[in-house]
Regions:
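Short, positively charged and aromatic/hydrophobic N-terminal segments
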Residues: 18, 23, 27-39
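Acidic-aromatic/histidine active-site loop/patch
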Residues: 261
Length: 458
């Protein structure tokens, strides 16, 4: 059934984008039954990434295999990156917690990478059943070289020799996302969202014509449709806007994958695994186009606030506080320092809740060393943000945002800005009300309820 849906949509002439091998300007063409054309008239090299919901069970794996088979039969070279099936990673983490309170990073990475190896092997079996020659490769086998940080490794290099050889032989390469091998020859994981980063890194290293990110939504929306049912789908978003959305809590794309795509100018197409309508293109900003003032409202409930009170106000104190956090790979987001009074000040900042125990331990030690008054934390917060490339040339956005929140009786605890984003920390209990009010106030409601039912599967 899914194959018929895809063929029908293609025959109807859905729009696709063809990009040059250097990821240059995009041209729009009507897609028919012929193969998409890559750079220099050759067959296209496409990287497709399928998330956990897309490969959650045997039925969905077979559906993904049909999609891959159809795309491959159109003459395309394909690299497919897969996540672990469904909640497999969460299950493995829970299992580790049952077994041990102390989990060495090396062993945890060895455990967690098993999820992607399972899904890649099963997908290759499903492809073989359709007559498609495919080979599964772990991150190590695919040549993804990382630093030595377990759990949050960063990609240093993609060799990709085995992938090139397989593609030259007409084979579909199915690569395990989320993982690589360190310079010390140890298995590493890239952290949450690492499969997105794997896909973009492969696309950049191998000169892919495009990178398709398949997920459980039909694209990037102006807000989370679960909170704002009238959120509208964005047909195009710039790398800069997507970076701000991802850093402000948008869950469609992982932040590091967008950074990689922007740095290497890899065009991304975010679309649903369950419907065949066009999704959202994430590309470099097009000259001559007037940007919308506000593209979206995002929220993030994954952070906690730490406040260090009565900090001595003298040079070097901030460095003494934040350098140990950086050394421990704790990402600090928003930072606010109060005006000095009586030679002391308060410093508040936000960190991921997942890093809270590490941050608390480090900050408590530093607070004693520098003679601060104490350390407080609050994990019942949410970050609500406005994002829009047109914001930098439109005055009054911050004032309007603050007025809307005030009218909703939402108290603002912290504020941070960039040229195209304004973020406010509010109480977690106020988050949904704040998002809905801002979405309406800035004219983002589509007027129709979001609905994306799964297609019938046979």
């Amino acid at each position: 059934m899914l194959l018929q849906l895809l063929q029908a949509d293609l025959a109807a002439g859905l729009l696709a984008f063809s990009f040059g091998g250097t990821h240059g300007g995009a041209t729009v063409s009507s897609v028919g039954p012929t193969a998409p054309v890559g750079h220099n008239g050759a067959m296209a090299l496409i990287v497709q990434k399928y998330g956990g919901t897309s490969v959650a069970d045997a039925e969905r794996l077979r559906a993904v295999a049909e999609h891959i088979a159809f795309t491959h039969r159109q003459g395309n070279q394909l690299i497919v990156v897969v996540s672990a099936m469904g909640k497999e990673t969460d299950h493995l983490i829970a299992l580790a917690n049952e077994v041990s309170r102390t989990q060495p990073g090396r062993e945890l990475d060895m455990l967690l990478t098993a999820g992607e190896r399972k899904s890649m092997a099963l997908l290759c079996m499903a492809l073989a059943d359709l007559g498609i020659e495919a080979v599964s490769l772990t991150g190590s086998q695919a040549g993804i070289i990382t630093d030595t940080t377990h759990g949050k490794a960063r990609i240093l290099e993609v060799k990709g020799d085995r992938i090139r050889d397989a593609l030259a032989a007409g084979t579909v390469c199915v690569v395990a996302g989320f993982q690589g091998v360190s310079t010390a020859k140890e298995i590493t994981t890239l952290g949450r969202g690492g499969s997105d980063t794997t896909a973009v890194a492969l696309a950049a290293a191998l000169g892919a014509d495009t990178c398709e990110i398949y997920t459980d939504v039909t694209g990037v929306f102006s807000a989370d449709p679960r909170i704002v049912p009238t959120a509208r789908k964005l047909h195009r978003v710039s790398f800069e806007e997507m970076l701000e959305m991802a850093s402000a809590g948008g869950r469609v794309l992982a932040l590091r994958s967008v950074e990689f795509a922007r740095n290497h100018n890899v065009p991304l197409h975010v679309r649903s695994s369950f419907t065949w309508e066009p999704g959202t293109w994430v590309t470099s900003e097009e000259p001559g186009m007037e940007d919308p003032v506000i593209s979206g409202v995002t929220h993030d409930i994954s952070e906690a606030k730490v406040t260090v009170t009565n900090v001595p106000d003298r040079p070097g104190i901030s460095a003494a506080l934040f350098e140990p956090l950086a050394d421990a790979n704790v990402i600090v987001d928003m930072i606010v320092q109060n005006t000095s009074k009586d030679g002391t000040t308060d410093i508040s900042f936000t960190v991921p809740k997942a890093d809270m125990s590490t941050a608390e331990r480090i900050v408590a030690e530093v607070a004693k060393e520098i003679g601060a008054g104490g350390v407080d934390h609050d994990d019942n917060i949410a970050k609500v943000s406005l994002v829009g490339a047109g914001m930098k040339t439109s005055p009054g956005i911050a004032a309007k945002m603050f007025r809307v929140l005030a009218d909703e009786d939402v108290n603002i605890e912290m504020i941070s800005t960039s040229t195209i984003r304004i973020s406010c920390v509010v109480a977690a209990s106020d988050m949904q009300r704040a998002v809905r009010a801002l979405h309406t106030a800035f004219g983002l409601d589509s007027g129709s309820m979001y609905s994306a039912p799964l297609p019938e599967r046979r």
